[in-house]
Amino acid sequence: MEVFESLKANLVGKNARIVLPEGEEPRILQAAKRIVKETDVTPVLLGNPDKIRIYLEIEGVLEGYEVIDPHSYAGFDEMVASLVERRKGKMAEEEARQILQDDVNYFGVMLVHLGIVDGMVSGAVHSTAATVRPALQIIKTRPNVKRTSGAFLMVRGTERYLFGDCAININPDAEGLAEIAINSAITAKMFGIDPKIAMLSYSTKGSGFGESVDKVVEATKIAHELRPDLEIDGELQFDAAFVPETAALKAPGSKVAGQANVFIFPGIEAGNIGYKMAERLGGFAAVGPVLQGLNKPVNDLSRGCNADDVYKLTLITAAQAVEQ
């Protein structure tokens, strides 16, 4: 089954509610129409109720969605008090009131925090920082998780792989890389991928030297100690991780080399370049970044996204909510 059809099937009857803070944006509205018509997910749109309803009614969507106007929200005072409490002395009441009136991402994240919705998708208009910052301040990371990270699902026909971290952590240390690998395994399983995780480097099993190689070797060791049940190997060059014939020469006996499907890059430079090369040269569709490690799911769109991207990331966010 195609990956998004599988996600849709798993969401039937789960009543997931995902807030889309940029509710008046045409790409968001087109995605909301499709979400209502094709899935069991309820989109919750922030914005002017009249504008949103008129648009969707013209498109033939009369029900199956919700609209919240942040400027007339009945629970606004409760939300302000909750934000002040959550920030623990770092935000006064007046500042909290102002930011919730002016910033739809903070408002949307608070809906997630309060359990009114199950997750949030934003970033069609806003920057990554504007989307992720309130999530880190309010939703925060899961217990025993020190950082969030960003993974891309790479799809071409029936092929599916996971690349991480391509979006958030610029130069993670060994502990950070190990954590990214473990969280990427969780994300991979959500997409029906049985994770075989390659810790990538310019070296395979001691063929090269340097601080970056040492970091990847140490990260692999830490990941093994934390999750001995996972199939993780490194350090591996990409050809050794992906090509069986090369793996037999460079990493004989490895349970991962030559058959990896989750690729952990040593830093954001390699990860960002790698996923874009696979997308542009290899013809893969890149879906994400999927944010990993948060207590509740919040995901960031590219400002160059289309309605299909919004639809897919909303399904992923709903799936994360159900999994958690």
Task: Kindly label every feature range from the protein language model.
Residues 1-257, 262-324:
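Anion-binding alpha/beta catalytic cores of soluble intermediary-metabolism enzymes, centered on
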